[in-house]
Amino acid sequence: YINHVSASPITFTDSGISSNVTTAMVSRYGSSINSYSEYKDFLFGFEGRTNPGISQTYLPINLSQGLFREAEDLHSVIDNFIPPSSLRVIEVAGWGLDTIASFEYYPRTVGCSGQGAGCISYLLDQRPRFTVDGDKTVVVPSAHYMNFRGNAERYWVNLEEHNNELFVDLRRNREHKDIFEVNQVNSFITSVIKKEDLVFDTVLKDTMPVDTKNRFRLSVHSPVTLSAYDINGNHTG
């Protein structure tokens, strides 16, 4: 998978003056993970990090190499499956919803308790990076994995278009977990089973949709309350 996607699943940044928080990561992997071997090294913590405490949920753990090998053994079998030419393989991916595509690890600036206002220290933190090429859970390249091998048909379900079709108060919120609630998906399955011609529209497509909208994403650290008001005093938050 990593060898087929254009964006790295993990990136790193450091401060102008070495923070000693991500410095070892940048030294070992550069600014991003670009290969499967680097990906494994990061998961195992080969840059030298130690396992965090139970309460430090914001820090990356070091995966068990034994369990990882078991997972690799499984994938060496299922990932190399090649369907017979008599079998029609179809992959349908949800598209248009903000989906986590990668994580950036960076040194977050924090104050130094009891050492004066000018003191600065750093804490390892991460921020998710989003893509619209997904259904809020699975990114399109993963949903279309079989096509990497050149033996599967690809289709897209524009969930953003589907969810915004109705009036504001009646809009839907279909995503990965309930993609089969989309009428076009059910009609598509029916047509495949009956060997009928496939019908495409603004929701079900045989080419990848193009995102032409500006998107606003806001990230904050808890505890915090977000509120928004319009000119009529309507409130959400």
Roles of regions detected by a PLM:
Residues 1-201:
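Helical cap/lid subdomain of alpha/beta-hydrolase-fold lipid enzymes
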Residues 200-237:
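Extracellular glycoprotein-like low-complexity segments
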